Structures are given as C-alpha cells and as structure tokens.
Amino acid sequence: MNSSPITQVSNPNDSLNHSSTNLIPSSHNSLNNYPQKSVKGNRKKKGSIINKLFCCFVPSNDQNNGNNINTDNGASNNDKLQQQKQYNQQQQQQYNQHQQQQQQQQQQQQYINKDSSQQNGEIPLMVPMIPRHVGLKTLVLDLDETLVHSSFKPVHNPDFIVPVEIEGTIHQVYVVKRPFVDDFLRAIAEKFEIVVFTASLAKYADPVLDFLDTGRVIHYRLFRESCHNHKGNYVKDLSRLGRDLKSTIIVDNSPSSYLFHPENAIPIDSWFDDKDDRELLDLLPLLDDLIKVEDVRLVLDESRNN
C-alpha cells in the first residue's frame, strides 16, 4: 500500500514520478470520456423473431373468421396489408416496452441484493442528511487529478502551496486547480449534497480543500482512512456513506476507486496541466439530467455497458 500522503495517477510528462524520493506513487490509468446513452442492440434481434411470428397472423374478423381479407367493406389488398403492418408494429412496440420494464425490474432487484449484501453493521461514514439536503442526490467527488493536480516539484504560478510533514521533514506541495473548478462547484452547490472522497491523507487534502472550497459548498470530507483496502487498492465503498445508492453518484479519474460500485460512477479523464480542459463544465448537463431520475444506476450502468 502507498505510504505517500498523496494518491494520484502518473503524469506521463512528469519525470518526478520516477525520482528517488518516490513521494508520488502511480495508480490506475483513467477511463475515456463518459459514453453517450444508447439502446442495446440485442433487443432488435428479439424483435425480428416476433415480427416473423406476427407476419403470418391477421386479426380475425367477426363476419368471416379472418379467412377472407379481400371482402371487408370493399377494402383493397393494399389497405389490408397496411392494417396488418400497423398491427404488427403495435405488437412489436408493446413487446419491447414489456421487455424493457422486465429488464429494469431485474436490474433494480440486483442492486437491492447487492446493497443488502454489503451492509455489515458498520457505522456510516456520514451522519444522516440535514433537513435542507433531504431529497437531494449525493455527489461524491475525487480530489487529485479530478479537481486539482499537486506536485512536490515547483510549478509555474501555482494556485496555492501547502506544507506537508513527511517523516519529520516539511515538504512544499504545489497545487494547481483544474480549469473551471470554481464554476463547477458554484453550479452544483445547491443541487447536490457534495462530498469530496480522496485516497490521499488528511494532512495534505484537508488544507488543499480549505483553499479550494472558498464558498464552503463541500459538505463532507473523507480521506484515505475511510477507503477500503482491496488487493492493494484504495476503494471508496459507497455503501458505507449511509446514503441511498440509487441517489449516489461518484466522479473519479481512477476506476479502482469505484470498483465496488461502477454503476454509480461517472469516469473523468485525469488532469495534469491542460489549460484548455473543459471536462468539469461538460459534466454539468449530465448531472442536471441525473437529478431528475429515480435511480441513477439505471442510466449510468446502461451507458457504461454500451
């Protein structure tokens, strides 16, 4: 396990990660940009089988028991074929809707079973929601390479410098904010219960958040000691937050961080120094959409699997 106070991914352009000090260890690579929602392809295949079944079926007529499709009020064969086509389409739509409802119900039951299996009687990491947050979804944000990038190596024009004690020696940590992070925090301030959950140590992350959160919009701060040690990875177990998982979202650049709850995750690219980065702004429309859904996992998990 890492002994460094900072947990972050490797910057391919930063030779400091390979220095003898070994103060900034590497982690997993980030995922690609958040995928767009799409309809699963296997439903079309199921529909084609139903079409084949329905193509040979014509609704019966009370007068001729469906044996004659050419003598109903003088309608032409083309009219009858068109009616049959419309009927088949209606049946197909009803079948697709039924299949989708069944799939969602099965998926929700899987989530319920998963949630129940992870409840082990531990005291939640957070106290119950305060009254003004009741009804809001919980947004869990990573810190390093998601909101900021920190380095023990001096950087040009850092946003702030944090002194950190390591083995009796004070080291200066140079912190740069991701583009638009201030706008991002302001935009979500009243829409979510906001939690920063980092695998870094509190002695580094706490003062960083003091500088970053000038508007005091972050409601909880969770650090490395709140992570779960799983096969050498710091995993952020969302089931320990004391919040309903269907209303919990995590934004993180490291897939290992949300290993237990990938269906709750919005992956974000790791940020180091790209001044043109707009990832945080690009997240806002998606977050606004998730506010409106009952179970965020149904949206995020479907997008992740397509």
From Swiss-Prot:
Biological process (GO), any one: hyperosmotic response
Chief place of localization: nucleus
InterPro entries: Dullard_phosphatase, FCP1_dom, HAD-like_sf, HAD_sf, TIM50
Protein's UniProt keywords contain Metal-binding: yes
Site feature Transition state stabilizer, where: 198, 236
Gene Ontology CC, one term: nucleus
EC number: 3.1.3.16
Cofactor-binding details, from the entry: Binds 1 Mg(2+) ion per monomer.
Location of the active site: 142, 144
Feature: compositional bias, Polar residues: 1-36
Catalytic activity reported: O-phospho-L-seryl-[protein] + H2O = L-seryl-[protein] + phosphate; O-phospho-L-threonyl-[protein] + H2O = L-threonyl-[protein] + phosphate
Entry cofactors: Mg(2+)
Keywords carried by this UniProt record: Hydrolase, Magnesium, Metal-binding, Nucleus, Protein phosphatase
Domain FCP1 homology: 132-290
GO molecular function ontology, one term from the record: metal ion binding
Residues given in the record as Mg(2+) binding sites: 142, 144, 253
Subcellular location(s) per record: Nucleus
Complexes and interactors: Monomer.
Role description: May function as a phosphatase involved in the regulation of cell growth and differentiation.
Full protein name: Probable C-terminal domain small phosphatase
Organism: Dictyostelium discoideum (Social amoeba)
Gene it is expressed from: fcpA
